[in-house]
Amino acid sequence: MKPYALLSLLATGTLLAQGAWAEDPEVLFKNKGCVACHAIDTKMVGPAYKDVAAKFAGQAGAEAELAQRIKNGSQGVWGPIPMPPNAVSDDEAQTLAKWVLSQK
């Protein structure tokens, strides 16, 4: 029975470690593929994070709006190329939005 307890403990530790990584916005941006179209201060296919932060600066509800766009995608906001929906949870979208808005 003890080997199962150890295995269970190790599995729980692995899940907790993955959860900690999921909270790191920079790791999320890499793991979710955001970096394929975005950079911090350089426009690529999509806008630079700093440009997004500047556009939303001072707007009420900016974090929730950006989180919704990250999760569901958007079109016609930054030009003709749409941003597709992303496979992120609500919490991940919120984490990403908060981090993007902190870029100045």
Swiss-Prot record:
PROSITE patterns registered for this protein in UniProt: CYTC (PS51007)
Extent of the signal sequence: 1-22
The organism's place on the tree of life at top rank: Bacteria
Pfam families: Cytochrom_C
Keyword Magnesium in annotation: no
One function term, GO molecular function aspect: iron ion binding
Effect of D24A: In strain: 129/1224
PTM annotation, UniProt: Binds 1 heme c group covalently per subunit.
GO CC annotation: periplasmic space
The keyword NADP is annotated on this UniProt entry: no
Residues reported in the UniProt entry to bind heme c: C34, C37, H38, M83
InterPro entries xrefs: Cyt_c-like_dom, Cyt_c-like_dom_sf, Cyt_c_ID
UniProt xrefs under SUPFAM superfamilies: Cytochrome c
Subcellular location: Periplasm
Chief location bin: periplasm
Protein function: Electron donor for cytochrome cd1 in nitrite and nitrate respiration.
Protein name: Cytochrome c-551
Taxonomic placement: Bacteria, Pseudomonadati, Pseudomonadota, Gammaproteobacteria, Pseudomonadales
